[in-house]
Amino acid sequence: MKYAHTCIRVKDLEASISFYEKALGYKVTREKDHSADGFKLVYLALEGDKTELELTYNIGHGAYNIGDGYGHVAVESDDLEGDHARMKAEGFDVTELMGLPGEAPRYFFVTDPDGYKTEVIRRGI
């Protein structure tokens, strides 16, 4: 078996695509328009990675309740401090740089328009 994708449901497809492209560098890899059946699917991936993030847009559905079971998705960064500063300057909802107790900062979180968190971690940790 091989990991294929993670699906999240979004209330505003264009806002979500823009967030994942601008904040994290994802690119749209494919789209499936099932508007006649009430939904659209957009798949995104990071450069050089075949694992996809699937954005599911159910037409006419409002915001989703993420609940307390969802944690986060994680991506690696070659320039953690630079990516953090850029996202903060561009107005994305980011935490401060963090580390585990007794360790130097090595990650932060950024939140998408629907409230889903992505952990950005220093590559090689």
What is the predicted function of each stretch?
Residues 7-50:
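Core segments of cupin and vicinal oxygen chelate
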Residues 12-13, 77-81:
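Helix N-cap motif at beta-to-alpha junctions
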Residues 16-19, 83-87:
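Hydrophobic side chains in well-ordered alpha-helices
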Residues 38, 69, 104:
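Exposed loop/turn and edge beta-strand positions of beta-sandwich/beta-sheet ligand-binding modules
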